[in-house]
Amino acid sequence: MKVKFETLGCKVNSYETDAMKKLFEDRGYSVTEDVADIYIINTCTVTNLSARKSRQFISRAQKENPDGLVAVVGCYSQTEPEVIEDLGVDIILGTQGRRSIVDLCEEALESKDQISLVKGLEKSRSFEELSIEDNFEKTRAYLKIQEGCNQFCTYCIIPYARGPIKSRDFDSVIKEAEKLAERGFKELVLTGIHASSYGRDTKTGLGLMDLIEGDAGVEGV
């Protein structure tokens, strides 16, 4: 079966889309830019414009293949799940649980029922491990190191869309950097929702500079 991805928003979203592509390809699916059987819309809600564009991408997918399955993930579905449900999509998933996206799509294809699994992030403290070994159509690799934000700036919805800060395990980041280097990527872009907060939620004593030095020490980078 063919899967088509549409991604709005930041580099973290781009990384997470690449990770979901890998999950589908590992299960034998083909990623396409044409008409597909499954559509994954990775949404953004940082502005009203991005939310509107997210709705437009959903509508476009539904029109492109009325019989296709449409799964909506990301920040917009995390903050406005009821709105997404009313759009008649098949799967609503927020900014957690993406590792199960293939299983959820297969479940929805079989049951034909709408699946909505958006959960509150207030007490979320664990980093969801999503990894890539390749970057689709890119010459440099993005590497997600951190999730969430604790700042709660008056104008910003991101803490509500992404939850509190969660740092990725140091060794996990280094291992992924090594895999990307083996694939020929010489430049790695460390990305996160509030990347400078890396390590503040852990007791390892390791911070962003330690991680930069660790990645810079990977052979080939």
Residue ranges and their predicted role:
Residues T204-V221:
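Alpha-helix-loop-beta-strand connector modules within alpha/beta enzyme cores
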Residues M1-Y198, E213:
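Proteins enriched for Cys/Gly/acidic motifs involved in redox and nucleic-acid/cofactor modification
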Residues D201:
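Active-site core of PLP-dependent enzymes with the aminotransferase class I/II
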